[in-house]
Amino acid sequence: MRTEILKIKGDWAEVLDDCRATVKKSPLGKEPSTEFKKKILIAEHSPIRAISVKFRWANIKYWIAMHWKTHHWESRVDSQRNDRQTRYDRDEAPQSAPIDFYGDPNIQHTIDTWRKRLCRQASIETRHYAEDFKAALYDHEPEWSDVLVPNCVYRGGCPEMNNCTWYDRMVDCNPLLASTDIQTRYDAYNKMFWEDRT
């Protein structure tokens, strides 16, 4: 599996200028600081929606792609219609049939979706795609990638009806995950995320 980042649409100068417009300040037309990006991403103020990412997962299993299609942002998959492809009969196609998935979510969409898909209760195969995307996005937008965290880290505790206890076990390993400071909690999670990938 490999996430291919095709394009980042919008830019941080626009986000900064949109924020300034809401308080009747003139645009600056410049890239904001890393500190500003981190703060606005954690605050989840509406100007962050001006930036989106177009990405592709090639040959993803159909059933995994359908987990992603349940989220409400632009996405496309290969047609399975028999008059559009000849790889298999649509009526006979297995759930594991490979398709290409193209996504086009904005920042807010990814924050909301990845909270669910990085969760340890999500299908492990689907979670691996979430992790791969987070890692690929980091090369283009590190501050954005860093706010993609599981719901338990986002909330500071597990909200699931059937708690998997992952968060509690991770807090035992790294108490900073229980911090009431959101940036501290996210930094602790991201440190663990990157250590697990090496």
Regions found by a protein language model. Give the residues of each.
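Family-specific signature for flavin-dependent thymidylate synthase
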Residues: 1-198
